[in-house]
Swiss-Prot record:
UniProt lineage: Bacteria, Bacillati, Mycoplasmatota, Mycoplasmoidales, Mycoplasmoidaceae
Disulfide bond positions: none
PROSITE patterns in UniProt: PHOSPHOTRIESTERASE_2
UniProt KW keywords: Hydrolase, Metal-binding, Zinc
Positions contributing to Zn(2+) 1 binding: H23, H25, K151, D270
This protein's record includes keyword Zinc: yes
Note describing how the cofactor binds: Binds 2 Zn(2+) ions per subunit.
SUPFAM superfamilies to which the protein is assigned, alphabetical: Metallo-dependent hydrolases
Residues bearing PTM N6-carboxylysine: K151
Protein name: Uncharacterized protein MPN_497
Superkingdom classification of source: Bacteria
């Protein structure tokens, strides 16, 4: 099988991915996050394009936007942005789910539709084209742009029954299509468990990234996850001093590199609010950092704490060329699922 990465404008050779921000946001068209803070509404194509051009100016080549259906995803706007940046920047979009708090526990389609019917919906987004209406119903209208990654999400310090259901659907979809997976972990909690569940269902650990571990600054926890499960940690939060200073994240990355775990580290900015991006901020009359922060501030800090240029290249380029490349599709084997996750499904009354 010829290896490929699936972008909005078509499949590319993994070698053409270049420096990649593996978890970010350019457009967020309302959704449940907007109820938490108005900064989660990001609807300026112009600001998004300017931000991307700064990323390109500093050597960036690819961005993975991690907005699943019904949580801010806007396929039409993103395709328009990708077309304007064609030849300069690769954009990858997501299908899948976020944390359970964003879905009605009784009436959402995640709650009502069985896993064996959800999986074909996700597979279709990857193999046929994303639904322009985000599976909001009752009409499905597929565009040409296909999803290139699957998102799952877990809440703070607990995995909800809807989240385990989504993890199962995401796992089967990954196995069926070969697509990679990224998991939102709320404040870096339940990361080990989420990864273990995906692996128990049969997902290739090399295709799993765990997001937001930087918000749970525990280098021993990081090492345990990598050592025991073989998955990758996506540190997506330089420029988040409200959680921790950059120096702490840089030192934790150095710690993992020194342990020999450089192949299990990726970096991103997760700049999913208006005031996390320079050009959105300027439109609001604010001076903010943006995508350039990674290159101007954080990468120099990594070098200052002793992370080598070779390790940085592995983190930004080589790892993602491997992780984001699709595996050969496999047939899901329910008999191979680990008994421990089946027991948990029974305890949580997931059919």
């Amino acid at each position: 099988m010829k290896r490929f990465v699936r972008t909005v404008l078509g499949d590319i050779d993994p070698k053409d991915l270049g420096i990649c921000d593996c978890h970010d946001h350019l457009i967020k068209n309302w959704g449940p996050e907007a109820k938490e803070h108005p900064d989660f509404v990001m609807l300026s194509n112009e600001a998004a394009i300017k931000e991307c051009l700064e990323f390109v100016h500093h050597g960036g080549r690819s961005i993975v936007t991690m907005d699943p259906p019904n949580v801010g995803r806007d396929v039409k706007r993103m395709v328009a942005i990708a077309e304007q940046l064609k030849g300069k920047l690769n954009i990858i979009m997501a299908t899948g789910f976020h944390k359970a708090a964003f879905y009605d526990k009784g009436s959402s389609w995640l709650a009502q539709v069985p896993v064996n019917e959800i999986v074909p919906m996700l597979v279709a987004e990857i193999e046929e084209g994303m639904d322009l209406y985000n599976y909001s119903g009752p009409v499905v209208k597929r565009g040409k742009a296909k999803a290139g990654i699957i998102k799952a999400g877990t809440g703070y310090a607990a995995i909800d029954r809807l989240e385990l259901k989504a993890l199962e659907a995401v796992a089967i979809t990954s196995i069926t299509t070969g697509a990679p997976v990224l998991v939102h972990t709320q404040l870096g909690t339940m990361a080990y468990e989420a990864a273990q569940h995906l692996i128990d269902f049969g997902v290739n650990p090399r295709k799993i990234q765990l997001s937001h571990l930087n918000k749970n600054p525990d280098e021993y926890y990081y090492a345990k996850i990598i050592r025991e499960l073989g998955v990758t940690l996506c540190f997506d939060g330089p420029d988040r001093v409200k959680y921790y200073p950059d120096c702490l994240l840089a030192k934790h990355i150095k710690y993992l590199v020194d342990l020999g775990f450089v192949k299990h580290i990726t970096l991103a900015l997760d700049a999913g609010r208006v005031l996390y991006q320079k050009h959105y901020g300027l439109e609001k009359g604010k001076e903010c950092f943006g995508f350039a922060y990674l290159f101007e501030r954080f990468i120099p800090l990594l070098k200052e704490v002793g992370v080598s240029d070779a390790a940085i290249n592995t983190i930004l380029v080589e790892n993602l060329a491997e992780i984001l490349a699709f595996d050969a599709p496999r047939q899901f084997n329910p008999k191979a699922v680990h008994p421990r996750v089946l027991a948990l499904k029974k305890q949580l009354k997931i059919e």
